Amino acid sequence: MINDQLPRWVREARVGTRTGGPAMRPKTSDSPYFGWDSEDWPEVTRQLLSEQPLSGDTLVDAVLASWESIFESRLGSGFHIGTQIRPTPQVMGFLLHALIPLELANGDPSWRADLNSSEKDLVYQPDHKYSIEMKTSSHKDQIFGNRSFGVENPGKGKKAKDGYYVAVNFEKWSDAPGRLPRIRTIRYGWLDHTDWVAQKSQTGQQSSLPAVVSNTQLLAIHTGGQR
């Protein structure tokens, strides 16, 4: 049962419906989900989100403003992305990663972009425990990490993989014939480093999330279209 004392955006955040994916790794004792049944994980996530200084409404506004500004910007001799230029999904994701921290900092200077590889993508300067990792993907409902996310790798200078995450899924050009691609889903929540599962092959380059983790620990705060 959802606690009616939580902020509206937290109460309205939606559990996912994905199926399949890799088998889940065990939770460790330092996980906020440790000892809870997976049926209770959405409420654990809601509690974690209610403690975040960055509200879901502010985050959604920053993501959508960043996405829109990609298409409004002029490059070279007046060229526009979406008209003369169609970047790869990797480049579109890079632009989101660059713009979202700037949009947030413009409204609240407590936030800034990372300055080195040991910091999260979105740094909350008053208290780094609220800093946020961003994941973007042109997949319809999944996000991916480097293979290192799914293996024990506490190497020097590596950023912590436990903590708050925002996941942004956007359309590819081929998904949007005759129009500009849109943001599919913005999800917000918490992931532990053990939630990531590396590809079994040693040559595989990706890690992914089991469906139960994706559905219950990353809750949808925006789905479909623009503002």
Curated annotation (Swiss-Prot):
Coiled coil: none annotated. Its EC number is 3.1.21.4. Residues 12-35 are annotated as: Disordered. It comes from the Bacteria. The keyword Cell membrane does not apply. It catalyses: Endonucleolytic cleavage of DNA to give specific double-stranded fragments with terminal 5'-phosphates. This is Type II restriction enzyme ScaI. Pfam families: RE_ScaI (PF09569). GO terms for biological process: DNA restriction-modification system. GO terms for molecular function: type II site-specific deoxyribonuclease activity. Keywords: Endonuclease, Hydrolase, Nuclease, Restriction system. It is an enzyme of class 3 (hydrolase).
